[in-house]
Amino acid sequence: MSPHLIYVVGPSGAGKDSLLNWLRAKLPAASPLRWARRTINRPATAEGEDHESVSNEAFSFLLETQQLAMHWSANTHQYGIRYSELLPLPQPSWVFVNGSRAYMNEAVASHPGMKVLHITAERHVLQQRLLGRGRESLENIEQRLNRTPHLNIPAGCHFMEFLNHDPLEVSGPKLLKALTALPGWPAA
């Protein structure tokens, strides 16, 4: 049985990674939910995402040998999801894919039935969060926010939008409640 795929996208500052980490920490380890590990051509860091770090050459080899079910470029890096990350478990399963808005339509086309979860926030909230990180100047943040792509949602796509304006201890349970409304979502 194929897993249910949830392709998660959102702009920088929306809290996508924080919410995914919250879900990972709160859901039982024995649940049929898992997170596809990304393959990225950047070094792994202790405080960063647990991804498979590969060189540019290794990433090119994975593409040439068709070992990636999904792949895209963003922020000077190459991202991919190996086919093995999308394999079903013995029981019905759900797989979260931390994806890209720019690649969303291609992902939906190549994985029929995939659900898209768009985690976002109003512009002023995104700006405040990005400023709080202290990684970019206000000018760079404004440029980032101005180039946010418009989402063209494919026909027939199960699309969910989650506005994340609240603190994590409020937004995490709200997101989980929204996910439990999906048909076939595992009982707690």
Language-model-detected regions and their locations in the chain:
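Hydrophobic anchor at the beta1->P-loop junction of P-loop NTPases
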Residues: V8
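ATP-binding Walker
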Residues: A14
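Walker A/P-loop
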Residues: D17
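ATP-dependent small-molecule kinase phosphotransfer cores
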Residues: R38-V95
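Conserved phosphate-donor/acceptor-positioning beta-strand/loop module used by diverse small-molecule
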Residues: V95-G99, S110-G132
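P-loop (Walker A) phosphate-binding loop of NTP-binding proteins
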Residues: P11
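Small-molecule kinase domains that catalyze NTP-dependent phosphoryl transfer to phosphate-bearing small molecules
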Residues: G132-L182, P186-A188
